[in-house]
Amino acid sequence: VNPEAAALFIRDYGDVLDFVIGSIHNMEKDLDVYYYDFEKIDVSKMYDHYVDWLLKLSEMGDFDVMGHLTYPLRYMFERNHLRLELRPYEEKFRQLFKNLTEKGRGIELNVSGYYKAMQDAMPPMSILKLYRECGGEIITIGSDAHKAEYIGFYQKEAHEMLETAGFRYLTVFEHRKPEFIKL
């Protein structure tokens, strides 16, 4: 989390941005979660700490949508086939979603887990439904496409997930203003 650097960037370039995603990749010591050795740590404790960082970001960052809320889960599964039960974090997610909705922000449904080992979206259906239950309406779809061939992947599945979770609209942004498109 580097809100100061992000704020400077947005101040200097905000007039040309349509959309700003806030996300957490790194926590302490600037080590991306990607590099964690999940066999040597208490993953429940680490994920609890990760959600605390998401809460901090929700309170102080200048962004439109929070990206891939369950980022560590992708690598827990990819490397160690670990699946973490998210129910213990439900109250923190409720607070996170309250923070986001009160500030007119949303979340991203990231489908990159489908074309990686995890075979699930980030966040999974249980968290999508919780976000909707908490009043969340602003939602985007991202594919985390680090390669051109992944742009637009799994859009049909993403739309179906959103409809199943109770969403009626997908959100796009222009000049950082949300626009709602019927699913």
Which sequence ranges carry the predicted segments?
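Charged catalytic cores and adjacent phosphate/nucleic-acid-binding surfaces used
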Residues: E28, R79-L183
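Extended substrate/RNA-proximal surfaces in nucleic-acid metabolism proteins
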Residues: V1-E102
